[in-house]
């Protein structure tokens, strides 16, 4: 569980939806310091490893950037092996005295797999291809699960609708969305 420290920057929602070899990762742009919005257009969904991996973060912003750098390093050591790179990152996260204090979570995806990396160093693969993290994560997750079986709606449309619902409910999530996708 991420505990809020009013001196750190927090607040976001990240959602990932996978259908076959297509995946979408979407996040809002709000950064909050305590209970104040300090930025509305932050980019918390990014491409890594030569654009073959998409990563989104929730939690303390500075901590998340540290994790992005570490993950990029692990991906360089284990190219094309997202699971292995994430497990190696999680091991470091659990064992390193400095990293253990980081307050962030990540969703990472490539053409084959989607994973959630938690603040306790767990690496989890969602059973149904849908994962969400952050302050509005449960709202986005619920909406995406409700829409996933609707005929004729793309995963990108589902992601946008789910994030709109999350942003309408969660005060730490806004409507400025960044979306990245990998399509077959």
UniProtKB/Swiss-Prot annotation:
SUPFAM superfamilies tied to this protein: N-terminal nucleophile aminohydrolases (Ntn hydrolases) (SSF56235)
CDD domains: protease_HslV
PROSITE patterns documented for this protein: PROTEASOME_BETA_2
Entry-linked Pfam families: Proteasome (PF00227)
Entries under InterPro entries matching the protein: ATP-dep_Prtase_HsIV_su, Ntn_hydrolases_N, Proteasome_sua/b, Proteasome_suB-type
Activation and inhibition: Allosterically activated by HslU binding.
Assembly, per entry: A double ring-shaped homohexamer of HslV is capped on each side by a ring-shaped HslU homohexamer. The assembly of the HslU/HslV complex is dependent on binding of ATP.
Family stated for the protein in its record: Belongs to the peptidase T1B family. HslV subfamily.
Protein name according to UniProt: ATP-dependent protease subunit HslV
Species this protein is from: Wolbachia pipientis subsp. Culex pipiens (strain wPip)
């Amino acid at each position: 569980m991420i505990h809020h420290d009013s001196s750190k920057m927090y607040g976001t929602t990240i959602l990932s939806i996978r259908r076959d070899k297509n995946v979408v990762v979407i996040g809002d742009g709000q950064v909050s310091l305590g209970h104040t919005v300090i930025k509305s257009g932050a980019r918390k969904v990014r491409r890594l490893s030569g654009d073959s991996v998409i990563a989104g973060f929730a939690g303390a912003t500075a901590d998340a950037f540290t994790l992005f750098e570490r993950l990029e390093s692990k991906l360089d050591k284990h190219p094309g092996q997202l699971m292995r790179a994430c497990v190696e990152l999680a091991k470091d996260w659990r064992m390193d005295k400095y990293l253990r204090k980081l307050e962030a979570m990540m969703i990472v995806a490539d053409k084959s797999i989607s994973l959630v990396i938690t603040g306790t160093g767990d690496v989890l693969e969602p059973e149904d291809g849908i994962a969400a993290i952050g302050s509005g994560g449960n709202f986005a997750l619920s909406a995406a699960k409700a829409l996933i079986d609707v005929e004729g709606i793309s995963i990108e449309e589902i992601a946008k609708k789910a994030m709109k619902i999350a942003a309408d409910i969660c005060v730490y999530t806004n409507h400025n969305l960044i979306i990245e996708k990998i399509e077959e």
